[in-house]
Amino acid sequence: MSGDKPVEALSEAEAAAELERLARAIADADAAYYQNDAPELTDADYDALRQRNLAIEARFPALKREDSPTDRVGAEAGDGFAKARHSAPMLSLDNAFTDEDVADFAVRIRRFLGLAPEETLAFTAEPKIDGLSLSLTYENGKLMRAATRGDGQTGEDVTANARTLGDIPVKLKGKGWPERIEVRGEVYMAKSAFADLNAREAEAGRKVFANPRNAAAGSLRQLDVEITKSRPLRFFAYAWAAASEPFAQTQFEAVKAFADWGFVTNSRMIRIKTVEEVLSYYQEIEAERASLEYDIDGVVYKVDRLDWQQRLGFVSRAPRWAIAHKFPAEKAVTTLLGIDIQVGRTGSLTPVARLEPVTVGGVVVSNATLHNEDEIARLGVKPGDKVEIQRAGDVIPQVLRVVEPGQGAPWAMPDTCPVCGSAAVREIDDAGRADVRRRCTGGLICPAQAVERLKHFVSRKALDIDGLGEKQVLLFHEKGAVKAPQDIFRLKKNIEAAGLPPLEEWEGFGAQSARKLYSAIDARRKVPFARFLNGLGIRYVGQTTSAQFARSFLSWQSFWAAVKAAEEGGIESEAYNELIGIDGIGQAAARSLMAFEGEPHNREMLAALLEEVEVEDEIPAETGSPVTGKTVVFTGTLEKMTRDEAKARASALGAKVAGTVSAKTDIVIAGPGAGSKLVKAEQLGLAVMTEDEWLALIGET
């Protein structure tokens, strides 16, 4: 298989096939991460796929696919605290696992910014604390709110608890702080304090904590503030958002300002200028890891200049200007007791290793992913074997190898769904290759798929219905009151029709909680375009892709009309080309939408759902720019900024960046070497401008 060959040994045909395989594999992994909140690959495995894709594209630039993978976020807020909406998302960081990953990160930064080789690219470097992220809002120097990270958009309001931490100033010291700012950092518990806490908990007959991070998170999220006050919590400040005015020119200066304002900052943070210095620092910190007073799981590097951070911007889950260099995964040996099958929302069957419980990195592990049947065959693993497992950060543990074979019989992947009994098949793509994952063909008749889709539909990243979580969805489904998304909005009627007692009489509910739930459901009868599309749980169409479609089509009606037209006309239709012409949208997403529309039961479900909800139009951000809402295409060589930076800037101004030229294109920016796109633009009579004219239009001359 071409997937086993070194990149330099691939023929052009093999490279094209490998790029297609990688596009599908990465899209599957992205869907699992963004849609299911259940990553199926370790960070290292995922990064290996992306790096191979990049290497092939670098060697065969002409083969780069339209759906080429591009850089693409914790847990939801609980019910015990008020929700707190972040003024700017609290994003995660992309990871690096090798020295080469770090070097590639620096190369990407230089390429994006268009830096000359001799120009200094400075970074800050600091230990990556393994704790709980916290955002602190200050107005006129006074602490107004403290919020946990949550899902990155909405966290929990833990202000009263945060005020008990000595490292968090209630009033900022010194001067120069902005009128309003969110200071962000990490709540943690020192190792010695953790040991003392667990000793006290054990002496009192209470359950002890697995590790310092769990202890810190559990202590901060106490409903009784006195319990939080009694716990030895610490806080490091290292980032910020939503500052009302600039207060520093570099990351290093900003963190120094935090210290001046009364925050505790990490004394190990340094400013460095070369990749060699970065890697030397990593080795130094790794060597000191065991002796530090707090747990760390890597080192974080950030571009030091804030103007460059602003230019670099963000992708959906992470800033382009920062990366976490993770320490090697921790490993252990245990016995494989059995292999269970989990059925996901899109029907994927995932084998899960059931293990003799073992402690790995301070966490008791009893399950680990086996990914798919090909991986099981590669490992030669079966129940009864002694296996080596590893756990890296918060990634699902994985089985690495068989250490000692057992006496158990060989294990085979079932060819029927263990939940509904439908056939489980490996889909064949256009090139005749089998999908790595076996999928249940039962669709919505499969209870496992139905429940998982319902959970996704009401999740924070989709409709975000307050008080309706996984537990409630499962209960309503088991009772027969909710079988499909539209049933959520018919809950009261369905309960009555099924002859069930009123909701307020159910165990765990009362009159007040029932009223609150019904009100929360009614509040979602108007739903934003992107949330609605993401909520449908269509394969390859997650949070990021849904937002891209919303920005491009603006209204649900026009978008779904294009999907219908593409499904009817096929891949040669103008509608299909319109879908894949959106920058960042590939063939996998477009074809998945067409397949969804092609299923009668999906059309019936969608029609019934649209009788219950109104999908709100996407409103372009009011940037005051003349390009807001315009569809633009870049072609040829840009000389004043890189292509990536130009696209990012256009999107920030509210423009819709497309990858192909059509009659719906408003502006084509053509640089030297522009080819077929320029010819087509001229044939269609579209507005064509040079890079300088474009910069003048957006006010960046």
Curated annotation (Swiss-Prot):
It catalyses: NAD(+) + (deoxyribonucleotide)n-3'-hydroxyl + 5'-phospho-(deoxyribonucleotide)m = (deoxyribonucleotide)n+m + AMP + beta-nicotinamide D-nucleotide. Zn(2+) binds at C417, C420, C440, C446. GO terms for cellular component: cytosol. SMART domains: BRCT, HhH1, LIGANc. Keywords: DNA damage, DNA repair, DNA replication, Ligase, Magnesium, Manganese, Metal-binding, NAD, Zinc. InterPro entries: BRCT_dom (IPR001357), BRCT_dom_sf (IPR036420), DisA/LigA_HHH (IPR041663), DNA_ligase (IPR001679), DNA_ligase_AS (IPR018239), DNA_ligase_CS (IPR033136), DNAligase_adenylation (IPR013839), DNAligase_N (IPR013840). One of its GO terms (biological process) is DNA replication. Transmembrane segments: none annotated. The active site is at K128. It is an enzyme of class 6 (ligase). NAD(+) binds at D43, A44, D45, Y46, D47, S92, L93, E126, R149, E186, K302, K326. Residues 622-701 form the BRCT domain. Its cofactor is Mg(2+); Mn(2+). Its EC number is 6.5.1.2. GO terms for molecular function: DNA binding; DNA ligase (NAD+) activity; metal ion binding. DNA ligase that catalyzes the formation of phosphodiester linkages between 5'-phosphoryl and 3'-hydroxyl groups in double-stranded DNA using NAD as a coenzyme and as the energy source for the reaction. It is essential for DNA replication and repair of damaged DNA. NCBIfam families: dnlj, PRK07956.1. Belongs to the NAD-dependent DNA ligase family. LigA subfamily. This is DNA ligase. It comes from Hyphomonas neptunium (strain ATCC 15444).
